Amino acid sequence: LAPLAHAVRVAAPLGLALLLPKPPGLFHQRPPQASVGVWILLLGAAATFTAHGMEALEHYGRFVDLIIGSADRWIGWDVSQAQAETALTIIGVHDILLAALLLMRRWRWIAGWMALWGFATALSRVSAMGGDSWHQAAARMANGAVPLALYLAWWQVVRSPASKTSP
């Protein structure tokens, strides 16, 4: 699952490079909803969320530690391993459902929720282990940035005068 879990790290630079505006006349500019860059971002986000969802359903040890550490550090709760594993089961279903909805429906609000969730889970390293683990959070910022880029690309389509439907 590791290659899929890191799909956004490959998709982010490639998809964003293809999504950026081109100088006039250099290339035919396709609308964002049909661009190759959007598809790369879409597949990268879906792959990452699916892989993380599967790891959560398997009660991956590091994820258990993140839940227990964050609960203790921020709200003073003593979360047991069984409680953390129950939460991971819910989170796993949540992540896989989000990935499926993103691929099947391409709703803008799903990409927005995935962005918030991706940033929150990236920052969970700092919330569980303290500021010294900022580099782990930074390495995972694409988990929220890629869905945010999708949200913004689809939002641009909706706001453009030629657009009549919402992606």
Label the predicted regions:
Residues L1-G61, Q81-V93, L103-P167:
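Extended, low-polarity transmembrane helix blocks
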Residues G61-I67:
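Membrane-interface loops
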Residues A99:
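Conformational-control "hinges and anchors"
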Residues I67-V79:
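Perimembrane loop-to-helix junctions flanking transmembrane segments
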